[in-house]
Structures are given as structure tokens and as C-alpha cells.
Amino acid sequence: MQTIETHSVLEAALEPWSEHLGAARVAYRNHAYRVFNFARGLLGHANEDETLAVTSAFHDLGIWSDRTFDYLAPSQARAREFLERRLPSAPAALIVAAIEHHHRLGRVRGGGGAGLIDAFRRADLVDVSRGIYRAGLDRGFRREVLACFPYAGFHGVLLRTGLAWWVRHPLRPVPVLRLAGKELEPR
């Protein structure tokens, strides 16, 4: 699969948040593009590019938009706002579900776009693990994506943000993890 270096929807989604992202802007943009490309590679087709672009742009954005490490609900809210304004015909429920489940421990199964949601979950894990978890992606493709979108300190930002959260919330150290459970309902 060819690496996509720019996508108009992903750019339009991120642009208004440049100031909130601050010094992490390049790191987060690159992360969003790596996850977008890895998810495309896992799906094996480009039929869902717009959905993946929106999901990639917003999946972790709540860290910066709402200044919290409990960021899934804020990220979903920002995605919904964007969709209402810019892409009202996009599959909002699927995008919100993909954001909700992207840190799920275990495979996403069932109906309702489970294949896309699980591909997105695995793509994010490939990136967050720095390729230790490969999800079956070709090594050459991963290297090509990383050459276009280097880490730029993204993992350090996550580590610092996560540790700061943990100090203030020791009983909820990783609030964004989701346990595998029931299958998704068909839509």
C-alpha cells in the first residue's frame, strides 16, 4: 500500500487545533498520519479513507483540547463537532466507536464496523509500541511511513502526560484502557 503523505480531511480536522497542540503539533500530526496509513495498510483498501482520516485526527486530541489524560470522551466530542460542521454525512457513530475502542485490550468483534475499528486499534498499537507490535504490517511499509512521519518526540509527550496524570490520579493510572468484552452491536 502506498503511503499517503497528506489528506485534506485530516489536515482540515487538525488545523484549528494547532494552537492547543503547541509544541506537540508536529508530533501529534505525525502520529495521526502514521496511524492513518497503518490502518489503511491493515484494511488493505482505501474505501474508508475519510473515516480513517477523521478518526486519526481526533482519537487522542482530547489530551490537548481538554488538557486531560482521560481523553476519550473529549476526543469523541471534538470529532462530533467537526463532523456536524464539515462532514454531516460521514459515519459519526463509527468514528466515535473507533475512538472509544482504540485502546481496547483485545480484538474488536461483531457488527457495526468492527473490522475498521479493530484495524484502527491495531494501527494505533503498532505506532505506540514503536513497531514492537507489528499487526502483520510489512516492515518495509512501516519504515516508509516512519520516514515520512518521524516520531518527533510523540512517545515522550505521552510518557510525560501519562506520568503527570498518574501522580494526580494514582487509582486511575490509565483511564483510557478498555477491557475486551461483548461484541459490538450491528448497525
Where are these regions (language model features)?
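Membrane-interface starts of transmembrane alpha-helices
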Residues: 88-93
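Short amphipathic alpha-helical segments, especially helix-boundary/capping motifs
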Residues: 8-16, 52-57
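Short coil/turn segments at secondary-structure junctions
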Residues: 18-23, 59-62
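Divalent metal-dependent phosphate-bond-processing catalytic cores, especially two-metal-ion Mg2+/Mn2+ enzymes
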Residues: 1-8, 13, 20-46, 87, ...
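Short gly/ser-rich anion-binding loops that grip negatively charged ligand groups
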Residues: 25, 65, 69, 85
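An active-site-proximal "capping" alpha-helix that borders the catalytic cofactor pocket
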Residues: 35-39, 70-86
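His-Asp-centered metal-binding catalytic motifs of divalent-metal-dependent phosphohydrolases/nucleases
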Residues: 50-66, 71, 75, 96-103
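Hydrophobic alpha-helical segments of small multi-pass membrane proteins
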Residues: 79, 100-101, 124-125
